[in-house]
A protein has these predicted regions:
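Conserved N-terminal phosphate-binding loop of PLP-dependent enzymes in the Aspartate aminotransferase
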Residues: 1-217
């Protein structure tokens, strides 16, 4: 995918957003020589950005557990663990965008499960209804959600909480569980990976095969 897709048309409207290097060893922006070094350097870049702008001015770090726009990039081992520690140290919320990775795409229910990290907030859409009806939402830990019990605020749209969307989501979740589709995505993803690796051996122009479950690049 193109990293600028969906972003450049709206700049500079989303102001006060700071971007950090992608934890992508194959094309590491920081010249890392190993996956472990890439994880360390890109996580360090997150901490450096927080310190440069001041922890009090940084509300959240937002990322996909496995990057979809870059073509199924799975961060090197240790990256998300380190980012979680950094966010906790400076009081920064960790937000996972699970619109693509949620509800079985990676062979786990959520990308958070795949990388073994609990975010403070998780956004989701698409997969909750398998695309049959437009539904999206957010899930938050008690640390975040309990604040709104004390100081609620109105944040909704005309068609928020449409009953047809709720019905579609519940029916879809039932099918995902009944037909074991999450584990099926894991098994089919393993098969796809093997085929892609075979193709890589046959075609020198293919430099990298990556991804998880049925999100591959």
């Amino acid at each position: 995918g193109h990293p600028g897709f969906g972003r450049t048309d709206y700049q500079p409207v989303p102001q006060n957003v700071v971007h950090v290097p992608q934890p992508f060893f194959y094309r590491c922006e920081l010249g890392s020589r190993s996956p472990a070094e890439c994880a360390e350097r890109t996580a360090d870049a997150v901490e450096q950005a927080i310190l440069f702008h001041g922890p009090d001015s940084v509300s959240a770090f937002i990322g996909e557990p496995v990057s979809h726009p870059y073509g199924g990039v799975v961060p090197p081992d240790g990256y998300w663990q380190r980012v979680r520690e950094i966010c906790d140290r400076y009081g920064v919320l960790l937000v996972f965008d699970e619109v693509i990775t949620g509800f079985g795409r990676l062979g786990t229910w959520f990308g958070a499960d795949y990388v073994g990290i609990t975010p403070d907030i998780m956004s989701f859409a698409k997969g909750i209804t398998s695309g049959y009806f437009p539904v999206g939402g957010s899930i938050a830990t008690p640390k975040v959600a309990d604040v709104f019990n004390e100081t609620p605020f109105s944040h909704m749209y005309t068609y928020t909480a449409h009953p047809a969307g709720s019905a579609a989501a519940l029916a879809n979740l039932e099918i995902l569980e009944r037909e074991n589709l999450v584990d099926n995505a894991r098994q089919r993803g393993d098969q796809l990976e093997r085929r892609l690796l075979d193709m890589k051996e046959m075609h020198p122009m293919v430099g990298d095969v990556r991804g998880a479950g049925l999100l591959r690049g």
